[in-house]
Amino acid sequence: MSILQTTNLCKTYGQKPNIVKALDGVTITVDKGEFVAIIGTSGSGKSTLLHMLGGLDRPTSGNVKVDNFELGKLNDENLTVFRRQRIGFIFQNYNLVPVLSVWENIIFPITLDGKTSDQQFIMEIVKLLGLEKKLDNLPNNLSGGQQQRVAIARALASKPAIILADEPTGNLDSKTSDEVIELLKVTSKKFHQTIVMITHNPEIAEQADRTIRIEDGRIAQQ
């Protein structure tokens, strides 16, 4: 069953005669529970595509459907709520709140919604990621790999429809990168969690269930 679909997605910048096509007719489908890597060189359009998938930017034409919701039909306010509730993000630079503890960072999106967190589920995530003894720590007391584990836990905590990971190993050494990718694979399987990961690294991409290659704003392989 597909959880994510794009249809003829286009994104242009600028005006004639200097229009730049960042995305040009991108159509992809991702099934529930799939771990997909989108790979491309710098300037290929992969980051622009991630922004479209996550509702962080709107396409010039075409549409994105997540969990049967067409993002283009949501106004800005509803899109913000949908993004918070149904899409988890993992960024290269972790994006943790420095004044909040590890635990507070993990439950932060749920707290923003005024909802009660599923503590049993979250503790299962915490144990899987090896964060049990770090819950009271502030982010600046953690290594880069530990901070990325917190970011993964935060993305999983709200049980999103999809998780979007933007170069999640970009700031990590090779050993820690391997550990983070392995954790993404394990969490995808254990929680049947859909993950779409952006990367420029072929070795990292090949560890996903499937690889989609983007070149010059178009899908070259999927």
What residue spans do the PLM features occupy?
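Conserved switch/coupling elements of ABC/ABC-like ATPase nucleotide-binding domains
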Residues: 216-222
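ABC family nucleotide-binding domain
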Residues: 3-214
